[in-house]
From Swiss-Prot:
This is UPF0181 protein YoaH. It comes from Klebsiella aerogenes. Pfam families: UPF0181 (PF03701). Residues 1-20 are annotated as: Disordered. It comes from the Bacteria. The gene is yoaH. InterPro entries: UPF0181 (IPR005371). Belongs to the UPF0181 family.
Length: 20
């Protein structure tokens, strides 16, 4: 997953995961 994007909040990460 995105373990190198700490700048993204949990909400943003979830949205990104949904996109993929």
């Amino acid at each position: 997953m995105f373990a190198g994007l700490p700048s993204l909040s949990h909400e943003q990460q979830q949205k990104a995961v949904e996109r993929i």
